[in-house]
Amino acid sequence: MLTVLGEPPVPPLCKYRAGGCVSCRDMSGPSTTLRNGLALAGFIVATFLAPLAGIFSMPGAWYAALVKPAWNPPSWIFGPAWTLLYTLMAVAAWLVWKRDGWRRPLMLYGVQLAFNAAWTPIFFGAHELGWALVEIAALWTAILLTLLSFWRVSRPAGWLFVPYLAWVTFATALNFALWRLNPV
């Protein structure tokens, strides 16, 4: 069996099947390493697909013209921050998958990814600061539920979601400030 970041050994995935299966009893072979590597790559790709929803809704002259709070971060920080956060999210989802398979925590992960993907077109595409605020509040809630669900399966996975929740908390405050400073 494999251990992850000092956690107890990962149980064989076939434990949920009656009697198990011969091919799944030993989870330490080369095929498991390949399977885990491909799964991690899949989680990274799937997670990085979320921001592609906003590729046609990038900040432009409209965003530059908005009145911003003094604590608005410089534009260059968003790319590196989101790259790090998406990587942490993917690794967290992979850790949960390794321990629990495709269950409720990963369904919540998919829901929060959908909310994540929806914010950019609403904010930057439709220029709807109020609706973007409603949407990001739903995203924040979905992230919290995902974090708690991940925590129950894998504490390291839960911890990996904390920076994401913190960043979206900040983004929610920023969205609120922009909405208040720029009435329609």
Regions found by a protein language model. Give the residues of each.
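Alpha-helical transmembrane segments of multi-pass membrane proteins
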Residues: 47-61
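Membrane-helix boundary connector in multi-pass membrane proteins
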Residues: 123-129, 145-158
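Membrane-interface helix termini and inter-helical loops of multi-pass transporters
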Residues: 59-71, 181-184
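Membrane-interfacial loop-to-transmembrane alpha-helix junctions, especially the N-terminal start
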Residues: 100-109
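Membrane-interface loop-to-helix entry segments
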Residues: 73-87, 127-139
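N-terminal membrane topogenic signal
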Residues: 28-43
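Membrane-interface helix caps and helix-loop-helix hairpins in membrane proteins
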Residues: 121-131, 179-182
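Final/C-terminal transmembrane alpha-helix of multipass membrane proteins
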Residues: 161-179
